[in-house]
Amino acid sequence: MNKSFFVTGTDTEVGKTVASMAVMQAVSKAGYSVAGYKPVAAGSKETEQGPMNSDAIRLRECTTVEVSYTDVNPCLLHAACSPHIAAELENETVDFSLLTDGLKNLQARSEFTLVEGAGGWRVPVTYDTTLADWVVGEKLPVILVVGVKLGCLNHAYLTAEAIRRDGMEIVGWVANRVNPGTEHYGDIVKTLEHHLKVPKLGEIPYMPSIKSRDLSGYIDIAPLGL
């Protein structure tokens, strides 16, 4: 039996990977086998094993079953820009069937699969399609990550509205403090709790570096039915 969820954010650079790591670590501590999946990544760096995406590397590090890099990230685009632009620059096509095959592979090998998106909910993967179109097709429940900063309320409201308009369920959300100097942090979180009306899975404090950190204590996985 596998449970799978999709992690999206209110924008790029709001902490989707940090939140994904925290959820995966918490689920693993609860005794489940866990796999992380970054179906589409834009932006790579050279490693001894070839080009890789740093977010996908972190998800692989939190994965508790044996996987290759391409198992975690089947579609790697090298330019650090919107996936549809990167794909055009590199003469590539984001193939939804490839993404689905990769998801099924991980679902068959783990009890819990966490899929991390690229950018926000409406990030385009071609000029006519978005990654959300694939998520809707896969019927993946959504975890929303809010990067708590000035302006995040509008971003969170609009993102939640778009997800629900697409017929998808938001099962929980995570507050990630991306700016330690954000004023009225508590009031912002309180407002989000009131408006989103779904369980808050946790709050992640500002962290300059997350390498080798155990983030599981910041997340409550009970709302995920585990």
Region annotations inferred by a language model:
Residues S4, V18-T93, G102-N105:
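N-terminal phosphate/diphosphate-binding loop that engages ATP/GTP or pyrophosphate donors
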Residues V7:
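Hydrophobic anchor at the beta1->P-loop junction of P-loop NTPases
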Residues V14-G15:
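Conserved glycine(s) of the Walker
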Residues K38, I143-V146, V171-R177:
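Short internal beta-strands
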Residues A80-V125, A132:
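Phosphate-binding/switch loop-helix module in NTP-utilizing enzymes
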Residues T126-K149:
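Inter-motif core of Ras-like GTPase G domains
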Residues A160-L226:
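C-terminal lobe/tail of nucleotide-utilizing enzymes
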